[in-house]
Amino acid sequence: MATAPLAFHLPFPFPSASRPPPRLLPPSRRPPAARLAATRRFRPPTADDEPPEAAEDSSHGLNRYDQLTRHVERARRRQQAEQPEITPDHPLFSSPPSSGEAGSYDPDDEFFDEIDRAIAEKREEFTRRGLIKPSAPAPSQPEEEDGLADELSPEEVIDLDEIRRLQGLSVVSLADEEDEEANGGGGGVDYGDDGVPLDDDGEVFDVADEVGLEGARVRYPAFRMTLAELLDESKLVPVAVTGDQDVALAGVQRDASLVAAGDLYVCVGEEGLAGLTEADKRGAVAVVADQTVDIEGTLACRALVIVDDITAALRMLPACLYRRPSKDMAVIGVAGTDGVTTTAHLVRAMYEAMGVRTGMVGVLGAYAFGNNKLDAQPDASGDPIAVQRLMATMLYNGAEAALLEATTDGMPSSGVDSEIDYDIAVLTNVRHAGDEAGMTYEEYMNSMASLFSRMVDPERHRKVVNIDDPSAPFFAAQGGQDVPVVTYSFENKKADVHTLKYQLSLFETEVLVQTPHGILEISSGLLGRDNIYNILASVAVGVAVGAPLEDIVKGIEEVDAIPGRCELIDEEQAFGVIVDHARTPESLSRLLDGVKELGPRRIVTVIGCCGERERGKRPVMTKVAAEKSDVVMLTSDNPANEDPLDILDDMLAGVGWTMEEYLKHGTNDYYPPLPNGHRIFLHDIRRVAVRAAVAMGEQGDVVVITGKGNDTYQIEVDKKEFFDDREECREALQYVDQLHRAGIDTSEFPWRLPESH
């Protein structure tokens, strides 16, 4: 399928694209010259000020230069007394200046050598008297700077060149600026419309470009707008407004615990009403609520706004206050049930490989660009206020594109945020299990379809769909019918992007991908068939925007792992260890099916179920694991206030056992195999269970730790303590070889000690 060039808000760096407009840097990120240009005055920070010089003492009739000359003369006479062979015409000495004649300050002149000699003599005297320690011998200095480069490693030479280049930025004093203006020149420096100095090629100096994406600290913008301006610009028509409409607003919040002084608090439902007092105490200056909320009592806030539709207000107000950042960025939305997070990470890496600074908001966090993480709540991707604020921060830090996970978790049935201007819509797949995400099947489909219905401009928008999913035609038909659709498939050769050949292994995935513009050979650390689908989706996005094929491959291959998503733990062991967040019977089944395709000798699986909820799924989880794993280790996963042994009793029902029957076998330290020949063990302490399972691994096996994924906590009773499955696996792998060398049999649980013990 032919792909037309896109006309995004900020052009992509393709050969046919024009240069993007200069980006305004945060004031605190500008180099000194940039700060001068923006304010026309430079005031160095206090830490940069030099200490004031001492007042010159002229009571003896000699100025500072005359005093210095006398010191030199005394040193000259002392030198002649100690070394008579050195005469005044010796090249060591310079001719003394005649009266009234200015002395030479040439750095190469012997005048400075004599000063150094006088200082050295004084140091020797103090050393002899024991006042100071002897100086260490000075290392020999190379005569030329190139000699230093010969002694450096290639990486150090590159760093040295970078330092020299950045040292070209100098602070310009106010006097220098006035002299330049008086002479009718600007020192050869051109400035952009925003006051930022331009490079020789006309581009704005960017600190992040100079020191690398990982070297620049993220800056957070400040916003200010009166309530009256916000209501006017957002086109929100309130039912009633009481109080001061000229109150200045600095932010918007719906979570009372996040409110800061100057914020507007959006009171949503009973939960919002419960947090109203806290928001008021934290400094909320205005409150927005709907007519169903009964606000009684006296609030310290200065204004109250009543609206008909609080959901619309929740979207419109933050978009307006944060200046609608999506209008100035290329925004890619990824929707679906599975693979959304991995696909978003791959697409972002591909964009950055193209040189497009790209942010992201997803369930694993938010990023301004590169690995520069933003402060965000875990559920930020489903919060319209948080998304607008995070995108504004990305834009403020120079991001040109943004990846948004348009998952149904936290998304209302009305669909994606209508205040976000999407450019590309991507579908991974649709799997609706019962009342998933609190929606019916129709609501679930319409919610994700709302993203594709926004694709109406054939010049700017694109749809990317997985035609192996039965719902693909429904999503492709949404929005404009003339908007290009890029399809991908695992085996369907009619798709624009499809696999030609692939190979799965315990440590790597290799795939040949056919595209309309050529064949791509991709080697990835992401494991399993499902990740091939995610790779295909990313390639399809690259095709949709006309990305260079080499950048598509480079970006995808740079992603070695997605935290907690079939994440490989590699400590150079002879067997695979995978950590995944699968915590439902369906996701566990798909995970183990994918692991089976890797061709392992055995599968050892650790599963746990949370306390105080979803008791019905506990036996089902065990049944799935016992059918698709050779060895199963049952354990706890955030038992909270429920007894972990009660949870394990429920889980054992999945294989027809009770806790009492299991413990009877424990009297002989032998647990018989299940009817299918598979083994099952349990331990209520998760740390013990995870480490025991890792120790069971042998060459060719795969140990799968499920449930937590990238979560880093364990909740027991009322305590929430740090716990990371990945770190537990790495720790256990350090000792497996030692256990085996000691003759300990870790294939059973409890472990079997050698007879010598």
Swiss-Prot record:
<keyword id="KW-0150">Chloroplast</keyword>
<feature type="region of interest" description="Disordered">
    <location>
        <begin position="126"/>
        <end position="152"/>
    </location>
</feature>
<keyword id="KW-0809">Transit peptide</keyword>
<dbReference type="GO" id="GO:0008360">
    <property type="term" value="P:regulation of cell shape"/>
</dbReference>
<dbReference type="InterPro" id="IPR005761">
    <property type="entry name" value="UDP-N-AcMur-Glu-dNH2Pim_ligase"/>
</dbReference>
<dbReference type="GO" id="GO:0009058">
    <property type="term" value="P:biosynthetic process"/>
</dbReference>
<keyword id="KW-0804">Transcription</keyword>
<dbReference type="InterPro" id="IPR004101">
    <property type="entry name" value="Mur_ligase_C"/>
</dbReference>
<comment type="similarity">
    <text>Belongs to the MurCDEF family. MurE subfamily.</text>
</comment>
<dbReference type="InterPro" id="IPR036615">
    <property type="entry name" value="Mur_ligase_C_dom_sf"/>
</dbReference>
<feature type="compositionally biased region" description="Acidic residues">
    <location>
        <begin position="47"/>
        <end position="56"/>
    </location>
</feature>
<feature type="compositionally biased region" description="Low complexity">
    <location>
        <begin position="1"/>
        <end position="11"/>
    </location>
</feature>
<dbReference type="Pfam" id="PF02875">
    <property type="entry name" value="Mur_ligase_C"/>
</dbReference>
<feature type="transit peptide" description="Chloroplast">
    <location>
        <begin position="1"/>
        <end position="53"/>
    </location>
</feature>
<dbReference type="InterPro" id="IPR013221">
    <property type="entry name" value="Mur_ligase_cen"/>
</dbReference>
<comment type="function">
    <text>Required for the activity of the plastid-encoded RNA polymerase (PEP) and full expression of genes transcribed by PEP.</text>
</comment>
<feature type="region of interest" description="Disordered">
    <location>
        <begin position="172"/>
        <end position="195"/>
    </location>
</feature>
<dbReference type="GO" id="GO:0010020">
    <property type="term" value="P:chloroplast fission"/>
</dbReference>
<protein>
    <recommendedName>
        <fullName>UDP-N-acetylmuramoyl-L-alanyl-D-glutamate--2,6-diaminopimelate ligase MurE homolog, chloroplastic</fullName>
    </recommendedName>
</protein>
<keyword id="KW-0805">Transcription regulation</keyword>
<dbReference type="GO" id="GO:0009507">
    <property type="term" value="C:chloroplast"/>
</dbReference>
<dbReference type="InterPro" id="IPR035911">
    <property type="entry name" value="MurE/MurF_N"/>
</dbReference>
<feature type="compositionally biased region" description="Pro residues">
    <location>
        <begin position="12"/>
        <end position="30"/>
    </location>
</feature>
<feature type="region of interest" description="Disordered">
    <location>
        <begin position="1"/>
        <end position="112"/>
    </location>
</feature>
<dbReference type="GO" id="GO:0051301">
    <property type="term" value="P:cell division"/>
</dbReference>
<keyword id="KW-0934">Plastid</keyword>
<comment type="subunit">
    <text>Component of the plastid-encoded plastid RNA polymerase (PEP) complex.</text>
</comment>
<dbReference type="InterPro" id="IPR036565">
    <property type="entry name" value="Mur-like_cat_sf"/>
</dbReference>
<dbReference type="GO" id="GO:0005524">
    <property type="term" value="F:ATP binding"/>
</dbReference>
<dbReference type="Pfam" id="PF08245">
    <property type="entry name" value="Mur_ligase_M"/>
</dbReference>
<dbReference type="GO" id="GO:0016881">
    <property type="term" value="F:acid-amino acid ligase activity"/>
</dbReference>
<feature type="compositionally biased region" description="Acidic residues">
    <location>
        <begin position="142"/>
        <end position="152"/>
    </location>
</feature>
